[in-house]
Amino acid sequence: SIFYCEYQNICVTLHQIRAFMNITLTYQRRQTTTTHVGGLSIGSKFPVRIQTMANTSTNNIEDSVTQAKHCVAAGSELLRFTTQGMREVESLALIHQALDGMVPLVADIHFQSDVADAAAQVVEKVRINPGNYIDPARKFKQIDYTEEEYQAELERLRNRFVLLINICKEHKT
């Protein structure tokens, strides 16, 4: 049967992925440990999980909640929202509240580590790109570092990242 909804392309794709995943393949999974995103267990003996990304504006609460419900009905087990700033974090908190635990939410963050810190307090998972995690100016220029400068930059990233990890631990993100 075909699941029809306003977001049909997303839903059909999720069903196709689910059907494909149920086929026995010769693929051997690597041994991993279990991690949890909300009430969802990932890794080790658990199946590969279906995640999709909302294409609504995160600040449009009503459309985002509607799309999330459609995606869950189609088989999505995790739902990612773009989170550009603090306004989107506030919107994610409202979306999370409206969905009432229906699906774990993921904040997709680039460039703004302070936004990641705030999002980690309202959703089940935060996705960052370490390559642009602390680059708020979005300067994609090539820089030739000395070994000392390179190590200092790594230490700066490490220190900032540890702060996020501690927030995630505190909030079980």
Write out the residue ranges for each language-model feature.
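Short, positively charged and aromatic/hydrophobic N-terminal segments
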Residues: 2-13
